[in-house]
């Protein structure tokens, strides 16, 4: 739930060297999501059943894993698989051998020169940090999200300027790289992003909802806030696992959430955009 607000993009002058189309000004709409902390949520019977089934499957996976002799090896494999799949959703595709070479180069202090592999390794490091930091009963905080993002972008071209920092300018999805005039989605303006993140973390630390439902809502809210210059999708999917850990749904394993989403990318992205709803709160669509 949320509302849309009109904004004006001033555009750039002829001295910018941009084409007329890219330097144009326009009116555009930003989406401002409602705060989540303290909100009440209701689910229809079908959704409630799906949530229950998903939680049962995750708990079964956790129980089966705990009976194995080497749970740490499986946990590392699942975390790595989840990180690679989450990266794939963003178009970052790296084969196993290529990733191993980049990992070995990083371990020896060398610059492997493989930009894509470095981004995937950054995602593995970010996920590892997030799930080592957030344990059952521990809070999810803005500093944890920022450090997760810093580790994600570490070793990339954007790391120094943007890693671990809330964006200070307007961003958008789709359209031109120079203005939001034809954007598919424009998240909230930068001056309210930090407050929205504080509220989101407060929601993540509630215990009134089933963990799977809470994680799904938190993920959608994070993506609608789009708090970073880059890496929002990967940190947002890591947040799903943070909620699972914090609520005690998982302790050792990382369920293959991104692996499933990666096989239904268009449906997943359409579903996320559908959560940016600004209609009547009592309607069926809401």
Language-model segment annotations:
Residues 1-286:
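FIC/Doc superfamily catalytic core
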